[in-house]
Structures are given as structure tokens and as C-alpha cells.
């Protein structure tokens, strides 16, 4: 299990774009399960939609990608690198996510060759499917300052 400080030591995302609160399970280089507690105070609810708050689907996909980045970047060989989003295939949204929901984010790395790879992401709320997608990624080095 990884807490928020451990997650922040692995991936560079920060508020308001850090969309993973905890990693519950992790198998190095293979898979992870994370959670995002969706609060009524999320900044995106101010405009999406004020009278009927719904978490934007693209942010659910981003949360899955961040869990995938933790899987990839927590290994010693990739520590200190960046994981870039390279593509999305077969993405489907099945249910709305609203304030008070807890998103369970499961990502499995399907294949990785060199710095390119693909994973499968599944997001659920209370055991009900919210989103499923295939995520492509590219690993890169951080630029020198």
C-alpha cells in the first residue's frame, strides 16, 4: 500500500491534477489498484455541472493513467523518469461519478517494449463498472534544468 506522500515521490502530479489518493495493491511492473475519493469540493464540479455535478470522463481516464504511471515508475529502473500518455483505445463510460463516490482504479500493464507500452484500466464505484479503457504510454527522461 502507498499513501499520498509515497505516490507524490513516484509521480510528478500535484493538486489540482493529482487524482489518486492511495494505492491499495501493487505488483511491480504488472498491476496496481488505487482509489480516488471524489469530494464535492473538487474544482471541476464548479463548471461540470453546477446543478448536477458529474466527474468529467477524461479525468477518470487520467486517474487510471496516474495509477498506471505508479506501476511503471515505482520500479528501480524507471525511478525518476516520466510516463507520458500516448493514446487511448476502446474507452467506454458506463456510469456517472458524483460527489461522495469512491473510485476504485485498477490498471494492468499488458505489454511494454523499451519505452513504449500498453495497459488496461478499469474504474468502478461500489463494484459497478464506471469506465474501461486501454491506455498507451511512453516513458521519457526528465529534462535537465
Swiss-Prot record:
Record's subcellular location: Cytoplasm
Organism superkingdom: Bacteria
List of catalytic residues: 48
Pfam families: FabA
Record key words, sorted: Cytoplasm, Lipid A biosynthesis, Lipid biosynthesis, Lipid metabolism, Lyase
InterPro entries: FabA_FabZ, FabZ, HotDog_dom_sf
Gene Ontology MF term list: (3R)-hydroxyacyl-[acyl-carrier-protein] dehydratase activity
Assigned EC number: 4.2.1.59
Catalytic function, reaction form: a (3R)-hydroxyacyl-[ACP] = a (2E)-enoyl-[ACP] + H2O
Any one biological process term the GO annotation gives: lipid A biosynthetic process
GO CC list: cytoplasm; membrane
EC main group: lyase
Role: Involved in unsaturated fatty acids biosynthesis. Catalyzes the dehydration of short chain beta-hydroxyacyl-ACPs and long chain saturated and unsaturated beta-hydroxyacyl-ACPs.
Record-stated family: Belongs to the thioester dehydratase family. FabZ subfamily.
Name assigned to this protein: 3-hydroxyacyl-[acyl-carrier-protein] dehydratase FabZ
Gene that produces this protein: fabZ
Amino acid at each position: 500500500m502507498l499513501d499520498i506522500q509515497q505516490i507524490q515521490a513516484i509521480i510528478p502530479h500535484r493538486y489540482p491534477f493529482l487524482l489518486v489518493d492511495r494505492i491499495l495493491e501493487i505488483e511491480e511492473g504488472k498491476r496496481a489498484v488505487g482509489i480516488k475519493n471524489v469530494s464535492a469540493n473538487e474544482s471541476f464540479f464548479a463548471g461540470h455541472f453546477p446543478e448536477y455535478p458529474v466527474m468529467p470522463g477524461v479525468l477518470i481516464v487520467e486517474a487510471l493513467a496516474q495509477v498506471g504511471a505508479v506501476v511503471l515508475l515505482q520500479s528501480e529502473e524507471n525511478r525518476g523518469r516520466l510516463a507520458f500518455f500516448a493514446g487511448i483505445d476502446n474507452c467506454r463510460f458506463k456510469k456517472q461519478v458524483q460527489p461522495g463516490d469512491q473510485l476504485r482504479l485498477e490498471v494492468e500493464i499488458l505489454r511494454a517494449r523499451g519505452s513504449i507500452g500498453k495497459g488496461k484500466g478499469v474504474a468502478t464505484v461500489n463494484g459497478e463498472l464506471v469506465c474501461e479503457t486501454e491506455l498507451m504510454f511512453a516513458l521519457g527522461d526528465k529534462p535537465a534544468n
